């Protein structure tokens, strides 16, 4: 088994090398710098069909997200109407060599590095989006990658998602609202190593079907332990041992979210022209 935890520039090359050497591969997100990177990986994956390839979208394994997924799939509150999300931190954190803030190393900024999780969750709860409008900027930190992405998207069913991915959120924030026909799900805060995103909570607010003055019915669930990393790796191991197909974080998921990210980048004509996307 090979675990790939490298800068975006090297991740696809290492993944391909692992598959060619007959290793099961777990690669942290993002899968590369651009769409071509993951497409190149998939070509090699198809040749090595017995090997397992999984990408690290660990947010899917947080309990608040798992519970929200169950509620949506149950249909008890009807269909999804829209999404509203904010995921942000106070800077594009520089690790060794500050590669995350350099386009030639990373391929993108806060959207590709952190916003990818929010986009993956929205895709996890719904399906692919075919209309995208965006404003992308690097006006604050002045790196050659984005520090803010303002996005509105629509899918074929008419469901709309609004998202702000930012590296100018001075108080770190994770918040995703999912509006259903009969209720609203609010995912607020997320457990992380930095412990800077607040308590992880899922608040369920039922739609008021009667008098406008009737008190809203709310249920709040708080989660104090993050087992997402363990669940993710346990699932990967189970799929290897029992020769099961990868369900969460497979190469199709990685390709879908990378295509969406580049739709977002290219939707801003100025950004597209500036970086020849």
Q: Where are the regions that the model predicts?
A:
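NAD(P)-dinucleotide binding in Rossmann-like oxidoreductases
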Residues: 142-144, 157-232, 247
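A short helix->loop->beta-strand "cap" motif at the edges of active sites that frequently abuts
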Residues: 21-23, 48-52, 159
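Beta-loop-alpha module in the N-terminal Rossmann-like domain of NAD(P)-dependent dehydrogenases
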Residues: 1-44
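Predominantly a Rossmann-like dinucleotide-binding segment in NAD(P)-dependent oxidoreductases
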Residues: 51, 59-142, 271
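Short glycine/proline- and charge-enriched loop/turn segments
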Residues: 22, 97-105, 212-219
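C-terminal helix-rich "cap/oligomerization" subdomain common to oxidoreductases
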Residues: 1-4, 46, 156, 236-277
């Amino acid at each position: 088994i090979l675990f790939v935890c490298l800068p975006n520039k090297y991740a696809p090359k290492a993944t391909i090398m692992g598959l060619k050497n007959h290793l099961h591969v777990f690669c942290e997100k993002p899968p590369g710098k651009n769409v071509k990177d993951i497409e190149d990986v998939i070509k090699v994956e198809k040749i090595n069909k017995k090997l397992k390839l999984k990408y690290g979208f660990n947010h899917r394994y947080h309990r608040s997200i798992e519970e929200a997924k169950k509620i949506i799939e149950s249909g008890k509150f009807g269909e999804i109407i829209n999404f509203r999300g904010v995921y942000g931190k106070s800077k594009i954190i520089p690790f060794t060599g500050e590669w995350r803030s350099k386009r030639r190393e990373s391929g993108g900024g806060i959207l590709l590095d952190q916003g990818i999780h929010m986009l993956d969750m929205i895709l996890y709860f719904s399906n692919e989006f075919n209309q995208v409008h965006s404003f992308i900027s690097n006006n604050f930190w002045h790196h050659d990658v984005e520090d803010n992405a303002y996005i509105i998207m629509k899918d074929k069913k008419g469901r709309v998602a609004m998202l702000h991915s930012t590296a100018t959120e001075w108080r770190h924030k994770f918040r995703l609202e999912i509006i259903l026909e009969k209720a609203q799900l609010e995912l607020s805060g997320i457990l992380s190593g930095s412990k800077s995103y607040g308590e992880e909570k899922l608040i369920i607010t039922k739609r008021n079907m009667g008098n406008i003055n009737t008190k809203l019915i709310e249920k709040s669930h708080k989660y104090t332990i993050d087992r997402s990393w363990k669940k993710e790796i346990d699932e990967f191991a189970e799929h290897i041992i029992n020769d099961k197909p990868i369900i969460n974080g497979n190469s199709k998921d990685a390709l879908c979210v990378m295509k969406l990210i580049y739709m977002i980048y290219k939707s801003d004509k100025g950004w597209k022209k500036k970086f020849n996307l």
